[in-house]
């Protein structure tokens, strides 16, 4: 098996642009850059086989750079994806993000927005789960959702906007999150594939409004859900939201806790809902303290 270090050295020599008289006689340097890129890909493959993934990722980045110099944008985009895979598997999330951003930029400039959306969503997951950069993750999910929507992929678009809304709510952007749930409700009405998610969307929208201390808006959401979605009207989600609104209006945090326990006995509350419900409870308790 070839030595990857030697392959990269050969690539570096191959990838030097022609100058002076040599440039006049040799013409385009594209073929030199293509050969240099091939050598870097060979080195990356060897590193990959050895499970030296960060070195493999670095080699793929060098290959992509030569491919761009050769004018092979499509190949460079694919090579950036390979670099991303290596860095991600090697635990180097920062370099994985950089590589994927370069790939997405190429794909979208080439009009490949569906492919760009796929990787934009993946980018959001890394930013959210590995780097905990929620602001950038929100931007990624939102843009991916828009690109999927342009491609008429409603289910995938909704998946992105749900992630976006959930993160906005956890970041305290309750009104913005509520607005996104409104869009999800609108896009899901009459759609047989996503209409079963409506109950959860109405509940989440109402929870965000309660967390924003706007019980009046939450009551409107409850009424809207009961009138527009027959499945929501008599559902546990509807009854739960009504009970929460009543508890907030009465300023009774203990009553709110009881309603949460009752609901949890039938339908397990997920981490997101528990976090938002705790925020609502804290708001009630703050009001109770202010009265003392």
Curated annotation (Swiss-Prot):
There is a cross-link at residue 261 (Glycyl lysine isopeptide (Lys-Gly) (interchain with G-Cter in ubiquitin)). GO terms for molecular function: ATPase activator activity; soluble NSF attachment protein activity; syntaxin binding. Pfam families: SNAP. GO terms for cellular component: cytosol; fungal-type vacuole membrane; SNARE complex. The modification N-acetylserine is found at residue 2. Keywords: Acetylation, ER-Golgi transport, Isopeptide bond, Membrane, Protein transport, Transport, Ubl conjugation. InterPro entries: NSF_attach (IPR000744), TPR-like_helical_dom_sf (IPR011990). It is a peripheral membrane protein. GO terms for biological process: autophagy; intracellular protein transport; SNARE complex disassembly; vacuole fusion, non-autophagic; vesicle fusion with Golgi apparatus. The keyword DNA repair does not apply. SUPFAM superfamilies: TPR-like. It is found in: Membrane. Binds to vacuolar cis-SNARE complexes composed of the v-SNAREs NYV1, VTI1 and YKT6, and the t-SNAREs VAM3 and VAM7. Interacts with SEC18. Belongs to the SNAP family. SNARE complex protein that binds to cis-SNARE complexes on membranes and is required for vesicular transport between the endoplasmic reticulum and the Golgi apparatus and for homotypic vacuole fusion. During the priming step of membrane fusion, is released from cis-SNARE complexes by SEC18 to establish a pool of unpaired SNAREs, which are required for interactions in trans during docking and fusion steps. Can displace HOPS from SNARE complexes, which may be a prerequisite for trans-SNARE complex disassembly and subsequent rounds of priming, docking and fusion. This is Alpha-soluble NSF attachment protein. It comes from Saccharomyces cerevisiae (strain ATCC 204508 / S288c). The gene is SEC17.
């Amino acid at each position: 098996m070839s030595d990857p270090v030697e392959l990269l050295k050969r690539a570096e020599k191959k990838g030097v642009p022609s100058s002076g008289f040599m440039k006049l006689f040799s013409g385009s340097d594209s073929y030199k850059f293509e050969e240099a890129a091939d050598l870097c890909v060979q080195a990356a493959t060897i590193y990959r086989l050895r499970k030296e993934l960060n070195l493999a990722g670095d080699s793929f980045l060098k290959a992509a750079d030569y491919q761009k110099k050769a004018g092979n944008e499509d190949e460079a985009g694919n090579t950036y994806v390979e670099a991303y895979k290596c860095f991600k598997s090697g635990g180097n999330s920062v370099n994985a993000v950089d590589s994927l951003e370069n790939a997405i930029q190429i794909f979208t400039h080439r009009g490949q927005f569906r492919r760009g959306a796929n990787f934009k969503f993946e980018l959001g997951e890394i930013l959210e789960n590995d780097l905990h950069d929620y602001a950038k993750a929100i931007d990624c999910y939102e843009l991916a959702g828009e690109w999927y929507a342009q491609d008429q992929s409603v289910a995938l678009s909704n998946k992105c906007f749900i992630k976006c809304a959930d993160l906005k709510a956890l970041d305290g952007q309750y009104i913005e999150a509520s607005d996104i749930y409104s869009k999800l409700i609108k896009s899901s009405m009459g759609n047989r594939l996503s209409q079963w998610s409506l109950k959860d969307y109405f509940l989440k929208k109402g929870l965000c409004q309660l967390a924003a201390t706007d019980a009046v808006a939450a009551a409107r959401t409850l009424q809207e859900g009961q009138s527009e979605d027959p499945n929501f009207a008599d559902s546990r989600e509807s009854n739960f939201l009504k009970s929460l609104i009543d508890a907030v209006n009465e300023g009774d945090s203990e009553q709110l806790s009881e309603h949460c326990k009752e609901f949890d006995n039938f339908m397990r509350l997920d981490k997101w809902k528990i976090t938002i419900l705790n925020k609502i409870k804290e708001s009630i308790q703050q009001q109770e303290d202010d009265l003392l």
